[in-house]
Each structure stands twice: as structure tokens, then as C-alpha cells.
Amino acid sequence: MRLLTRVLLVSLLTLSLVVSGLACGPGRGYGRRRHPKKLTPLAYKQFIPNVAEKTLGASGRYEGKITRNSERFKELTPNYNPDIIFKDEENTGADRLMTQRCKDKLNSLAISVMNHWPGVKLRVTEGWDEDGHHFEESLHYEGRAVDITTSDRDKSKYGTLSRLAVEAGFDWVYYESKAHIHCSVKAENSVAAKSGGCFPGSALVSLQDGGQKAVKDLNPGDKVLAADSAGNLVFSDFIMFTDRDSTTRRVFYVIETQEPVEKITLTAAHLLFVLDNSTEDLHTMTAAYASSVRAGQKVMVVDDSGQLKSVIVQRIYTEEQRGSFAPVTAHGTIVVDRILASCYAVIEDQGLAHLAFAPARLYYYVSSFLFPQNSSSRSNATLQQEGVHWYSRLLYQMGTWLLDSNMLHPLGMSVNSS
């Protein structure tokens, strides 16, 4: 019986994934096979994402120069990919040294270049710099940046080369000069390198019994305060963590409201429900990335009478905290520290994200019905291990295949995190 149930659940899961994938089809093209998307070349001096290189939304802050004698030199790894030409004008092999993340993105780009221009290879003119030839705090000093061209040095290709670099996953790409393209990545251990959508473990949720519980202590089956699609407060089943990490330090956005003064702390890619300052209609609220919320907008706060109330955002700042948790409820929403938030992240579409988690909700309800457990045994038996949940990891990977890269937050989860 148990085997049959598992087979049935896997079948339903697979079917739901296929349907969710097809639903991403544009308009009347629903269910049709997508044609390869057209690559739009970057313009001269354009950079993607459209923020400064060493900010949270791009490659993150400078962490210090690496020399051959420093402890961090072991973070660099040589790249001997035969499909990449290294200029290496210093004749020291320095241009081949880079972080593993930079190496992975560069190797991916090399394949794209050969596929796009048969007979042409990727060329690296500058990698790790140990001679001080760049400006202060350049990411070249950490092996996190490369300057690239094509092997034929055809400048008419550089705009498209920039776009290919974006598609390959570099965290910041800059059509810097007529002579080369500049690309960089996040640090391997950077708090910016892995974000996804999370709350700190100390954030509080409200329970149906009137008490409160820290997010990190939630167990499947706990009924927590959330909101339905009409904006009504409800108590919803906590189903799972899409990510559960007790140790990693991450950067969180802190969004603080005016009267009443409340704060919610969440990662950049997490969705928060907002209203424009010009309206009080809760039905017009939309889900926006925490990193895109601005002072003057409104968020939904649970007031003393237990009702949702729109309150103006007073200020926004960032802080580092250790530990991050991403809870999912049956309704796809959750009230954290008295402010209504989504359970989802990375893609700025609450409806699509909630649809994508339909198989997870189905599995929870079916397993709860077939294998009822008391709260203590459920706490011990079903609480997941640390790391990104396999289903969340799968959805993110599918999203990178099916959706345009600009539909995903630049600080989307690391599919290699554990």
C-alpha cells in the first residue's frame, strides 16, 4: 500500500511539474514549444544588472587582495580549458587563476561562444592580477573578474559576447571598452553569493493558539497566521522549509514602517506585499522583491484589532545575520513580525510561484491523511535537514531553463547550496 501511494504521488508530481512548465508559455502560445530566444547585444558602456559592480545586487563587496603568500591564495584554481585562449602577457599563468565560481561561468561561456560562432573561441586578456595594474579594490585582485574578447578580436561581436556572458551566469557584465568586456562574480563565501528568499531564524510568527514561535522552530502541521487570496487573515498549515540554514551569515533587508512602528527582516529576493502610497485598497496589493521596496510605499501590518492595515514604509536598511529559514504555508503567505509577506522568492509572480508549489501541497495533504501523526512524532520524523529542499532546487533549475533570465532575481538561490 505504501509503495503504491508513493508511486501515485510521484506520478502526480511529475504531471504537475509538466503542467506548471507549460503554463509558463506566453499568451496564445500556451503549451507550444519555445523557439530559442533572440539575444539582444549590450550597448557600449551598458552593464547588467543595472547596479554598481560591488553592490549586493551584482558581484558584492570587495573582500581583500589575494597574493601568492596569503592564506586565501588556495581559493584560486587554474583554468586549463583548451577552448579558452589566455593572453597571459605576464608569462606567469596569473590570468588562468580564478575562483571556482568564476571558472564555472567562464567555461560555460566558452561553450556558448563556440556554439554561436563556429571556429571562434573565447579569449581572456586579464584574470587574477598580482601586479597592481587595476584600480583600488578591483575584483581582479581576488580572481573574481575577467576581461574577455573573442579569439578573432572582431569588435562587432562584443555586444553579443556581453549578452552571452550574462546568459552564462556572470553576476555582473560590463561592456567596458571597445577592447574588451569585463565580467565578475560573487565571492565563494560571500553573504551575497547565496540568497534565495528567507527570514532570520529569530523572526516570529503567530500561532492559532494565540502564542508565537520563532520561524526556525516551526514544525509541519503548525497553524500560523497568513492571508488568503482575498486579503483575509487566516491560519494556514505550515508545510515545509524551502531552505533551512542555521549557520551561514547573509545580508537581510530590514523594512521599517511608520505608525505603528514594525520591522520585517528578509533577504533581497523574497517577496513582500506592497501598495502604492496613493491607495488604501488592499485588493491592489502586489508582490515585490524586498530589494525593490521603497520608502513611501505601503506594506500590510496586522494592527492591534487583528486586522490587516496598510502602513507606510519609513526606512529600509540592510544588516547581516546568521541563519536563514524559508517557510511555506498552504496559502503561500505568512505574517512575520506582524507584517504580511509571501512564502516565495526569486520570481516576482506570486500566482505562478504558488501554482508551482501545488505538488508540494498535494503531497503534504495526502501524506497527512494517509499517515496521520501526533505533533511530537511529526516534529521529530518529518522536519527536514539543513539546506535547500530538493523540490525548491528543482523548481529553480527549471526556472532557469524555461524563463528569461531577467524574470529571476539576480540573487536567486545557489542550486549547489546544501
UniProtKB/Swiss-Prot annotation:
Residues reported in the UniProt entry to bind Zn(2+): H140, D147, H182
Coiled-coil regions listed: none
SMART domains membership: HintC, HintN
Record site feature (Essential for auto-cleavage), residues: H270
MF terms in GO: calcium ion binding; cholesterol-protein transferase activity; patched binding; peptidase activity
Domain of life, per lineage: Eukaryota
Site (Involved in cholesterol transfer): D243
Keyword line: Autocatalytic cleavage, Calcium, Cell membrane, Developmental protein, Endoplasmic reticulum, Golgi apparatus, Hydrolase, Lipoprotein, Membrane, Metal-binding, Palmitate, Protease, Signal, Transferase, Zinc
Chain positions recorded as Ca(2+) 1 binding sites: E89, E90, D95, T125, E126
Gene Ontology biological-process annotations: adenohypophysis development; anterior/posterior pattern specification; axon guidance; blood circulation; brain development; camera-type eye development; cardioblast differentiation; caudal fin morphogenesis
Site for Involved in auto-cleavage, residues: T267
PANTHER family: HEDGEHOG (PTHR11889), SONIC HEDGEHOG PROTEIN (PTHR11889:SF36)
Family classification: Belongs to the hedgehog family.
UniProt subunit comment: Interacts with HHATL/GUP1 which negatively regulates HHAT-mediated palmitoylation of the SHH N-terminus. Interacts with BOC and CDON. Interacts with HHIP. Interacts with DISP1 via its cholesterol anchor. Interacts with SCUBE2.
Protein name, per record: Sonic hedgehog protein
